[in-house]
């Protein structure tokens, strides 16, 4: 069995905002409320998009008519998965249960070696629920 770090992406809709910073704050707060306290091992962050002209990365936020679409990234470790595809399914299932009606897309799956830390042991138990 292998261990994987899975990164998922979701588009989060935020209404009645005027700035990108407000949209980011509201999106992360709303996602965090839906995930915590059950899934405190899932990391939430804003995704980045590359500028088509210069290639520089910037925050994945688009605002029109005081409504924002924020690209959020969800990261979690999956322990004892049979394959990368199995780890993807586990991560989508665990995170998707809390984020109903929010489509999730797999961005990256990387294998890692278990370090044997106490925190990793706790995450293993939570990831399998």
From Swiss-Prot:
InterPro entries: UPF0212. Signal peptide: none annotated. It comes from the Archaea. Belongs to the UPF0212 family. This is UPF0212 protein MA_1372. It comes from Methanosarcina acetivorans (strain ATCC 35395 / DSM 2834 / JCM 12185 / C2A). The lineage of its organism: Archaea, Methanobacteriati, Methanobacteriota, Stenosarchaea group, Methanomicrobia.
